[in-house]
């Protein structure tokens, strides 16, 4: 069972202090026991749930709202400025009214019974008050200890937090210094790389004319090489010169009859006409040589044979010349 003891003043006796005790099982709306005492006498009454419902119907209010108003007046301990209590010792009638700005209305009324042994009621009331005070004091002490513990924890946390803040600031300062050092190193490295890049670009600019000069010289040499004769052309020219020289040396001899031009003319004529075989001039030449050999003396015959052998070698050289090859 729950209890609530409050101190009130009656409207008829404002200088006298009364103590009002209300106890209930579940809620105030389910019924309660009211006890009133002035320290000498005591009055009590039991209010049922049906009576509360009847009072709510008489006031045209809902039961829950009416029970809430009773709880505020009897249990919450509101001051006399909001609620007014009226009690008559002769009739033992107890009523309470709620005061508004300009009006007041009756919230409830109960018929109390005087307790024959008021001392027991007062003793129970005092014991309850003392127990409540002890309980509240123990709870207060427990809360105070808890508050002290929380305060110590808070101080400890605050100290750790301050240390963490100091360490954080020191770490930030150290990291900032390291960042500045790394940044300066990077800037220095970037400057050196830019400087090296500029030097390389300047060197490339300086080497570019030399490269162009070398390229132009190389192109000139290649043009000169392309303008020169090939190995085959050079060999052919050398052979032609040798053949010409040998022909000149042979042609300049007064003792040898040069029959090569007539033979060559015949050879060209036969090639252009394309009707006679190439071996016919050689046969005619051999016949002419035989007739000439029969008419000459023996000595001239030997000389003629020697000359014929030279002419044959000359013909071989002439046939091996570049002109005969291309013919």
From Swiss-Prot:
Phosphorylated by PRKDC at the C-terminus in response to DNA damage; Ser-253 constitutes the main phosphorylation sites. Phosphorylations by PRKDC at the C-terminus of XRCC4 and NHEJ1/XLF are highly redundant and regulate ability of the XRCC4-NHEJ1/XLF subcomplex to bridge DNA. Phosphorylation by PRKDC does not prevent interaction with NHEJ1/XLF but disrupts ability to bridge DNA and promotes detachment from DNA. Phosphorylation at Ser-320 and Ser-321 by PRKDC promotes recognition by the SCF(FBXW7) complex and subsequent ubiquitination via 'Lys-63'-linked ubiquitin. Its main location: nucleus. The modification Phosphoserine is found at residues 53, 192, 229, 249, 253, 294-295, 308, 313, 320-321. It comes from the Eukaryota. It is found in: Nucleus; Chromosome. Residues 255-327 are annotated as: Disordered. Gene3D superfamilies: 1.20.5.370, DNA double-strand break repair and VJ recombination XRCC4, N-terminal (2.170.210.10). GO terms for biological process: base-excision repair; double-strand break repair via nonhomologous end joining; immunoglobulin V(D)J recombination; protein localization to site of double-strand break; response to X-ray. InterPro entries: DNA_repair_prot_XRCC4, XRCC4-like_C, XRCC4-like_N_sf, XRCC4_C, XRCC4_CC, XRCC4_N, XRCC4_N_sf. This is DNA repair protein XRCC4. It holds the Pfam family XRCC4_CC. There is a cross-link at residue 208 (Glycyl lysine isopeptide (Lys-Gly) (interchain with G-Cter in SUMO)). Residues 179-210, 179-211 are annotated as: Interaction with LIG4. A motif (Nuclear localization signal) lies at residues 263-268. There is a cross-link at residue 289 (Glycyl lysine isopeptide (Lys-Gly) (interchain with G-Cter in ubiquitin)). The modification Phosphothreonine is found at residues 230, 316. The lineage of its organism: Eukaryota, Metazoa, Chordata, Craniata, Vertebrata. The modification Phosphotyrosine is found at residue 226. Residues 1-211 are annotated as: Interaction with IFFO1. Residues 308-327 have a biased composition (Polar residues). The record marks 258-259 as: Cleavage. Keywords: Chromosome, Coiled coil, Cytoplasm, DNA damage, DNA recombination, DNA repair, DNA-binding, Isopeptide bond, Nucleus, Phosphoprotein, Ubl conjugation. GO terms for cellular component: cytosol; DNA ligase IV complex; DNA-dependent protein kinase-DNA ligase 4 complex; nucleoplasm; nucleus; site of double-strand break. It comes from Cricetulus griseus (Chinese hamster). One of its GO terms (molecular function) is enzyme binding. Disulfide bonds: none annotated. Residues 133-153, 183-213 form a coiled coil.
């Amino acid at each position: 069972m729950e209890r609530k003891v409050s101190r009130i003043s009656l409207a008829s006796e404002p200088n006298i202090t009364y103590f009002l005790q209300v106890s209930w099982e579940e809620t105030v709306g389910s019924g309660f026991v009211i006890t009133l005492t002035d320290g000498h006498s005591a009055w009590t009454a039991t209010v049922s749930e049906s009576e509360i419902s009847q009072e709510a119907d008489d006031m045209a209010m809902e039961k829950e709202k009416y029970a809430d108003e009773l709880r505020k007046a009897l249990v919450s301990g509101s001051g006399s400025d909001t609620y007014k209590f009226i009690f008559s010792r002769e009739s033992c009638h107890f009523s309470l009214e709620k005061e508004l700005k300009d009006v007041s209305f009756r919230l409830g009324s109960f018929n109390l019974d005087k307790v024959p042994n008021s001392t027991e009621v007062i003793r129970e009331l005092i014991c309850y008050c003392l127990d409540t005070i002890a309980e509240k004091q123990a709870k207060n002490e427990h809360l105070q200890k808890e508050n002290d513990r929380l305060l110590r924890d808070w101080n400890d946390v605050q100290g750790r937090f301050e240390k963490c803040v100091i360490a954080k600031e020191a770490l930030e300062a150290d990291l900032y210094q390291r960042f500045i050092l790394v940044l300066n190193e990077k800037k220095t490295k970037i400057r050196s790389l830019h400087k090296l890049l500029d030097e390389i670009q300047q060197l490339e600019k300086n080497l570019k004319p030399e490269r162009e000069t070398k390229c132009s010289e190389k192109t000139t040499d290649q043009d000169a090489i392309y303008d020169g004769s090939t190995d085959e052309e050079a060999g052919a020219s050398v052979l032609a010169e040798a053949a010409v020289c040998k022909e000149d040396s042979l042609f300049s001899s007064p003792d040898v009859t040069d029959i090569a031009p007539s033979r060559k003319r015949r050879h060209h004529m036969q090639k252009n006409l394309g009707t006679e075989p190439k071996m016919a001039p050689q046969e005619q030449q051999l016949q002419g040589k035989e007739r000439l050999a029969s008419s000459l003396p023996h000595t001239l015959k030997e000389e003629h044979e020697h000359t014929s052998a030279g002419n044959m070698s000359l013909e071989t050289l002439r046939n091996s010349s570049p002109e005969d090859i291309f013919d």
